[in-house]
């Protein structure tokens, strides 16, 4: 391979690396909201995406209001927020 081809390949790889989202950063903006149990007290386990750990984690949801970073299963949280 000529040096020109190698430079082109290196440039394309660099561009690809810059444009490829880091896992978890490609999801909806609400995936970066904090866990919000809401004002009610009908507590049940739920899952939210934690951008600091880049994982879906369990929290206790009160059953009403809160925000959209709230999923019934870890699988659903992962499907929506981890990319």
From Swiss-Prot:
Keyword Disulfide bond attributed: yes
Cystine bridges: 31-81, 40-64, 56-77
Residues in the signal sequence: 1-24
Short name of any one Pfam family annotated for the protein: Kunitz_BPTI
Major site of localization recorded for this protein: secreted
GO cellular component, one term: extracellular space
Subcellular location: Secreted
Domain BPTI/Kunitz inhibitor per the UniProt entry, residue ranges: 31-81
SUPFAM superfamilies: BPTI-like
Single annotated GO MF: toxin activity
UniProt keyword terms in alphabetical order: Disulfide bond, Protease inhibitor, Secreted, Serine protease inhibitor, Signal, Toxin
Protein family: Belongs to the venom Kunitz-type family.
Protein name: Protease inhibitor 4
Organism: Walterinnesia aegyptia (Desert black snake)
Organism taxonomic ancestry: Eukaryota, Metazoa, Chordata, Craniata, Vertebrata
